[in-house]
Amino acid sequence: HLTNRRQRQMCIRDSIYSIEDLAQLIHDLHQVHPKAKVSVKLVSEIGIGTIAAGVSKANADVIQISGHDGGTGASPLSSIKHAGLPWELGLAEVHKSLLDNNLRDRVLLRTDGGLKTGWDVVIAALLGAEEYGFGSVAMIAEGCVMARVCHKNTCPVGVATQKEELRKRFKGLPDNVVNFFIYIAEEIRQILSTIGVKTMEELIGNKEFLTTKNISLPKTENIDLTSLVNNEISYKDRSWIKHSNNAHSNGTVLEDSILTDAQFINALTTHGEFSKKIEIKNTDRSVCAKISGELAQ
């Protein structure tokens, strides 16, 4: 049992209040596992472009834009119905903001939140996404019925439960999910052939294929989609689409001299002891995090 004071302390310690806090967390993660890419998930909202620019400068490797339509059965109903904006709006704003600030080549853009078809993937690519996340629909393909009791251990179809009698009800097969994604890929291939494009790479961030439908409906007559299809600003330089396969580096850090020390390496491989005195300055960040990562591996 935790007291209210203890709960508040834990909440404060685990929260991110600024880009600086996030940058420090990303730095910590890169220290612990230098080869691992760090992904930051942002909910689609007005002003997300400015936030994404800060996240990119904070050395994130991937920025994930999540739309309002997403949410698995474990998500609160209020989050599924009332949180965030469509991923299309957030993705378009982030892509443009990163291009305007010469940051687009530093991060991969990923989007999710209600993606269901190959058409959704193509639209996401045209708006700037390079990776695409499927959650709920992939779970449904293997048998999920969205009962929204994942956290109660009472899943009626045995997807999210540890109870043996319920797990016996699970009829899903890996092939079901594989077939779903095969048809997604086939739909994408058909769309590419229709518009005369050979590869997905040609689509990414290329708005010349986007236009609005000339359909007049009362509920959409006041919606302005100019920001999504406006191609007046031409970004002819597409060098940003080539990303490094390696995670961002923190550069030379204090622990590097220790990690290359022969005595340390011997102690690490033989589970022996190692002792060394070093001077730590206030500019040294995440001290010993890299060593902890090496020990964990």
Residue ranges and their predicted role:
Residues 132, 140-207, 211-212:
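Active-site or pore-adjacent capping/gating segments
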Residues 41, 56-72, 197-254:
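Terminal amphipathic helices with adjacent charged low-complexity linkers/tails
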Residues 220-297:
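Charge-rich, low-hydrophobicity low-complexity segments
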Residues 20, 29, 36-37, 187-198, ...:
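Short secondary-structure junctions and interdomain/linker hinges
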Residues 7, 31-32, 70-74, 104, ...:
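Short acidic (Asp/Glu) and glycine-rich catalytic loops that position anionic groups and cofactors
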Residues 1-8, 12:
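Single conserved hydrophobic/aromatic residue that forms the stacking wall/gate
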Residues 13-17, 42, 46, 171, ...:
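Generic amphipathic alpha-helical segments used as scaffolds and interaction surfaces in large
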Residues 15-168, 284, 288-293, 297:
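Glycine-rich phosphate/ribose-binding loops and adjacent secondary-structure elements
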